[in-house]
């Protein structure tokens, strides 16, 4: 057996429909297009969404804006109040927060937000909001913003 000798099984391929070759051929006369009308004429017919002259649905509905991002960037978010339980002079990174049990899953880069109170001096190695940075520096800590 060679590749050149291969052929499909009997009945695996349907015969092409030959229209307009006489009534006895089965698809003569109107060739399966019915009697009259736009869809029986030659040419491409109607465009997608055409409703016979009626205002189509896609034009009746309002235009919607502000679709959500298809591939948004996710962050692991921690508020300043959660960092209050850490020991003084701790270096705060995503890895150290996972070891301490404050963060349970890595959803992306760490971002510190300003909700809550902080009285412990910490060194934060992550991007912070302005409110979070003010609270960390007011407690005697420092922020090394990355990214």
Swiss-Prot record:
Part of the 50S ribosomal subunit. PROSITE patterns: RIBOSOMAL_L15. Residues 23-35 have a biased composition (Gly residues). Binds to the 23S rRNA. GO terms for biological process: translation. It comes from Synechocystis sp. (strain ATCC 27184 / PCC 6803 / Kazusa). GO terms for cellular component: cytosolic large ribosomal subunit. HAMAP family: Ribosomal_uL15. Keywords: Ribonucleoprotein, Ribosomal protein, RNA-binding, rRNA-binding. Transmembrane segments: none annotated. The gene is rplO. GO terms for molecular function: rRNA binding; structural constituent of ribosome. This is Large ribosomal subunit protein uL15. InterPro entries: Ribosomal_uL15, Ribosomal_uL15/eL18, Ribosomal_uL15/eL18_sf, Ribosomal_uL15_bac-type, Ribosomal_uL15_CS. Residues 1-52 are annotated as: Disordered. PANTHER family: 50S RIBOSOMAL PROTEIN L15, LARGE RIBOSOMAL SUBUNIT PROTEIN UL15M. It comes from the Bacteria. Belongs to the universal ribosomal protein uL15 family.
